């Protein structure tokens, strides 16, 4: 299985985010994201967490998925406001994904 490159994972997550954010985020968060994204926005691939089973109710192989966060960074370049966390399968033939939205 060819793993997603970081750029591919980021592009996929951002496309899904843009498509689904309106249905899953609070209007105030959407406004904040839109106003701040150019200056502070970030979409980053991070090390795949092993606690996704607690979030989605099923065990996953961290090596089979990419984890991507969409949010805003602070002045220390740390993402301190995460709007969505994505878990995206590396399997192009069965592109499975899960999203945890900001509450």
Curated annotation (Swiss-Prot):
It comes from the Bacteria. InterPro entries: dsDNA_mimic_put (IPR007376), Put_dsDNA_mimic_sf (IPR036763). Disulfide bonds: none annotated. Belongs to the putative dsDNA mimic protein family. May act as a double-stranded DNA (dsDNA) mimic. Probably regulates the activity of a dsDNA-binding protein. This is Putative double-stranded DNA mimic protein APL_1348. It comes from Actinobacillus pleuropneumoniae serotype 5b (strain L20).
